Amino acid sequence: MLGAENIINKEKYPLDQPKTDVWKTLAENCKSAFQQSGVAILKNFVQQPILDRMITETDSTIHRSHFCKDNHNVFFEEDDNTLPADHPLRMREDTSLNSIPHDLMNSQDALHLLYNWDPLIRFLSEVLGYKLFRMADPMAALTVNCMGAGQNHGWHYDESQVTITLLIQRPDDGGLFQTIPDLRKKDTDDYSQLGSVLKGSDVGVVTLNVEPGDLLLFAGFYSLHRVTPIKGD
């Protein structure tokens, strides 16, 4: 039986040893990176043999996934026809993906075990500076977003302050995670640059180097981001 402690790269990430200097240094480095840029990437967090298992388990469930096809603005809000037609809040983005909800996952699936591993949530709480709790929603607590040929996630902001994502498989091409860091401020939105990006400008766009097995901590509430169209199955 697979134990959660055997899922991650423990030589590099001894998350179950919080009293060690290695753990404390790792947490501090991740915290510093996240505070500076809104991004922290734990490279090679899960190694290939476990990724292969995660892919197999996901493939066995994808036929039951929820298909999502949406035309939305960056905030996922209803259209406001009191605004000019070319206002960024009225500009639409297309998103197409399949999502596997938490309640369809087997309790012994590697992703499920990792999500419920206490040392992981303790470490992430230390990095983010506040206590994290697992979501009680039986469907949305943990989801797997799957994209095939032509699917993508259009420009948007997240509803949550922070998103934690593990990439388990690379597409043949495309599928780039792109962002404009801190485009949105606590009290203001830069509609001028937002409008330019939605019209096709790549000024300020950063492509994150996220590989299969990497764990990404991302402040998606303030940073505009997207996943470019996928090529391959």
Feature roles, as predicted:
Residues 8, 178, 182, 229-233:
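Non-heme Fe(II)/2-oxoglutarate
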Residues 40-46, 209:
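Short amphipathic
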Residues 1-36:
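Fe(II)/2-oxoglutarate
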Residues 46-47, 53-63, 84-138:
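Signature of the catalytic double-stranded beta-helix
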Residues 65-74, 136-139:
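A short, aromatic/hydrophobic, helix- or strand-capping loop or linear motif
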Residues 153, 224-231:
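Short beta-strand His + acidic residue motifs that chelate non-heme Fe in jelly-roll/DSBH
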Residues 106-112, 121-215:
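Catalytic core of non-heme Fe(II) oxygenases with the double-stranded beta-helix
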